[in-house]
A protein has these predicted regions:
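Iron-sulfur cluster-binding cysteine motifs and their immediate structural context
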Residues: 296, 300-319, 329, 384-410, ...
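Short acidic (Asp/Glu) and glycine-rich catalytic loops that position anionic groups and cofactors
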Residues: 1-5, 23, 31-34, 282-284, ...
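Non-catalytic, well-ordered alpha-helical segments in soluble enzyme domains
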Residues: 14-40
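A cross-kingdom feature strongest in bacterial/archaeal respiratory oxidoreductases
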Residues: 1-9, 39-327, 339
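Flexible glycine/proline-rich, aromatic-decorated loop/lid segments
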Residues: 1-2, 325, 429-446
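Alpha-helix capping and helix-loop boundary segments enriched in small/acidic/polar residues
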Residues: 7-11, 363-370, 374, 378, ...
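Surface-exposed acidic, glycine/proline-enriched linker/cap segments
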Residues: 3, 271-272, 329-374, 440-473
């Protein structure tokens, strides 16, 4: 593949590859080097065409995979495991990776898809082992998540002290996990110097180590965006079925519609409306579909939304106060039994007030080996949005295209709309996050602001914001269609 630069160089510097060529005594540029060597590979095609297409497809002979004996490595790994202590697995997070992007505030604030914690690394441990070592997590009075500290010691004496603990449902007993990539001090802004450096425990190119764990004093304050772990027996809202049932059974069997009572009759909820319907014969109408069968909760869409819509980064302390600004979130829910169907059965068998209270209290806790479900949530652009009816200044309104609009310069920040939103997807600017030295996350200097999308307004303090269904893109589509006479 051949890639071209998208913008000119920002600083008067040499490309890394040009430096390597200079060290090798080559006075040419890396561009000339690539072009010269490409000529020996490209056959039947011109350099300009390959540069235009970005890729050259050639024919190569089949390569046979070599054989190797992995038994020695397996035996060495087995011997490294001790019958005592725990097995530590060092891993890289989906967002931050191995730490090369630790200066990227988007990735620092991105909540882990499983633990839903941002701005931190921590040791994950099973519920059984947490009880054994007297480690715990708790939701405190201000809604924040706190956790115990622990000290990890490897068999060769390497030690990492005061590691925060997350009790992780579904984790294998006898194992703990710790993310690499955190704890860097060099070449980082002060705000990004978070977490602990787990590379001190990485020995012999082996990410699995035998360790001992001891409890340490104190409590750690996490920035967690989701305190609810389970659906508390409401697993029937997860509409899942098999391909066979989907193809052979009526939709009412695998996707029953909710019913409401009207005039002493049970009718489908979609047939009842307090408001007059909109005239859908006028205007363009857009739809955003999310394939929940394909969604793994990776969160790449969350970062894409941040980049496209100039969503500000607020930092760990603000996230802990539930002031994160993500327009799109991916909720993660565990079953309290081994499956969500088991949750439904348990709820159906509840009888009496005392049984109800005790059972639902237990169902708030995730099972030891639960089923997991991910749910992307953004503004649903409701037909008759409850946020629209409570805004005293009509800052949020419904368009002919079916989108729920926000007029930022009309908003006075009452936050009534956020209170009335059933999906809790509205975000309030508690501070001015751009051009503010208190929030040094690349929106307060000229270089950092170069990443902002010029087609999207940067919001100010006291203004509510939310998913716009990328209205700048839908408007661009409409303008293109007009130019083409469609």
């Amino acid at each position: 593949g051949i890639t071209q630069p998208t913008i000119r160089t920002l600083f008067i510097t040499k490309q890394f590859q040009d430096v390597l060529l200079s060290l090798n005594g080559d006075t040419g540029t890396f561009y000339d080097y690539i072009k010269t060597n490409a000529a020996t590979i490209i056959t039947g095609s011109s350099w300009n065409k390959v540069l235009h297409d970005g890729v050259y497809v050639g024919s190569i002979s089949a390569i046979s995979a070599g054989s190797a004996d992995y038994s020695a490595a397996a035996n060495a790994l087995a011997k490294s495991k001790s019958s005592q202590g725990l097995e530590l697995v060092l891993y890289t997070k989906t967002g931050l990776g191995d730490g090369q992007q630790a200066n990227n505030p988007w990735l620092q604030e991105f909540p882990d898809p499983i633990t839903r914690v941002s701005w931190d690394n921590y040791v994950t441990i099973s519920n059984a082992d947490a009880k054994k070592y007297e480690l715990s997590n708790e939701i405190v009075a201000n809604g924040g998540l706190n956790g115990s500290y622990a000290t990890i010691t490897t068999v060769d004496g390497a030690k990492l002290e005061n590691v925060p603990v997350i009790v992780q449902p579904g984790q294998a007993v006898g194992t703990i996990g710790l993310a690499l990539g955190y704890g860097r001090k060099a070449a980082l802004k002060e705000e990004m110097m978070v977490g602990l450096n787990a590379y001190s425990l990485y020995k012999g190119f082996n990410n699995v180590q035998s360790v001992t764990l001891t409890k340490a004093g104190g409590e750690h304050e996490f920035a967690c965006v989701q305190g609810q772990k389970t659906l508390m027996g409401r697993g029937d809202i997860i509409k899942e079925t098999s391909l066979e049932i989907f193809n052979t059974k009526d939709a009412k069997i695998w996707n029953p519609q909710p019913m409401v009572s009207l005039d002493h009759k049970e009718v489908e909820a979609t047939t009842v409306d307090l408001w007059s319907s909109f005239d859908r014969s006028v205007g363009h109408h857009f739809n955003l579909s999310v394939d929940l069968n394909a969604c793994t909760g990776c969160g790449a869409c969350v970062i894409a939304c941040h980049a496209e819509n100039n969503v500000p980064v607020v930092g760990k302390s603000e996230v802990r106060r539930s002031r994160d600004m993500h327009w799109l979130r991916i909720d993660r829910y565990y079953s309290s039994e081994s499956t969500f169907e088991g949750d439904n059965e348990r709820k159906a068998n509840i009888s009496g007030l005392s049984s109800s209270l005790s059972t639902f209290n237990e169902m708030e806790k995730a099972g030891d080996n639960p089923q997991v479900s991910f749910q992307p949530v953004m503004c649903q652009h409701c037909n008759h949005a409850p946020c629209e009816t409570v805004c005293p200044v009509a800052a949020t309104s419904h368009s002919r295209q079916g989108q729920n609009h926000m007029a930022y310069n009309r908003c006075v920040g009452t936050r009534y709309c956020a209170n009335n939103c059933p999906y809790k997807v509205r975000r309030f600017n508690w501070f001015l996050y751009n051009k503010n030295s208190e929030f040094d996350y690349n929106m307060n200097d000229d270089l950092g602001r170069m990443v902002l999308n010029p087609d999207v307004n940067v919001r100010s303090r006291g203004v509510m914001e939310k998913c716009s269904m990328c209205i700048q893109m839908t408007q661009l589509t409409i303008l293109k269609a007009k130019r083409e006479g469609r």
